[in-house]
Amino acid sequence: MKNQYVPVITLDGPSASGKGTIARLVSQALGFHYLDSGALYRLVALAAMKRGVDAGDEQGVVGIARSLDVSFADSSIRLDGIDVSDEIRAEACGEYASKIAQYSALRVELLERQRDLRKLPGLVADGRDMGSVIFPDATLKIYLTANEEERARRRHKQLMEKGINASIAHLVLALRERDERDSKRVASPLQQCEDTRLLDTTGLNIDQVVGKVLGMYADSGSIE
């Protein structure tokens, strides 16, 4: 495994479980690099949508990924030199990304891009297969989850802050459908591995969850 001596914390879990926010804050607390794997798939989705490639066109989508010009710097995510940090968070982009994430060829194409981000002093990576596929030798693997209602409320809050209206009932159904699609896909399905620690964040605030993750990392014996 490339750079196997560099510590890695993986946070996997379903959509709206809070893994992105928690991973970013944990990386800041430890001074580690941060990998938002979902952003890579959303970037492919956005690029494909802009070029009129249908989500059902696997070869077309993989071709887009192969020539993807992206950069992560200064808290911004850039596609072809343009900041698309907000654009990739749109629901339509997320739905497209969820559909194309089932393609084995696409996951292979993005595999090394993700592993190349494993650099000193360490990495915190969030996604759905970070601990099971991308970094199976991670120092600490956590499966982050929350009940459907809590996740729907979090997603609703995110959308409202962006001026996007959505009903919680609709979001519950959308999350349920996405969970089923993510867990049943053939390529790297969403699952909790045997060596992954479960962290249910239902009823917990952000600081509490970050504290628990940092505590787990300290307990792993990786902090000297």
From Swiss-Prot:
Pfam families: Cytidylate_kin
MF GO annotations: ATP binding; CMP kinase activity; dCMP kinase activity
Keyword Cell membrane: no
Catalytic reaction(s) noted: CMP + ATP = CDP + ADP; dCMP + ATP = dCDP + ADP
Alphabetical UniProt keywords: ATP-binding, Cytoplasm, Kinase, Nucleotide-binding, Transferase
Main location: cytoplasm
Protein origin, superkingdom: Bacteria
Record's protein name: Cytidylate kinase
Lineage, broadest ranks: Bacteria, Pseudomonadati, Pseudomonadota, Betaproteobacteria, Nitrosomonadales
Name of the encoding gene: cmk
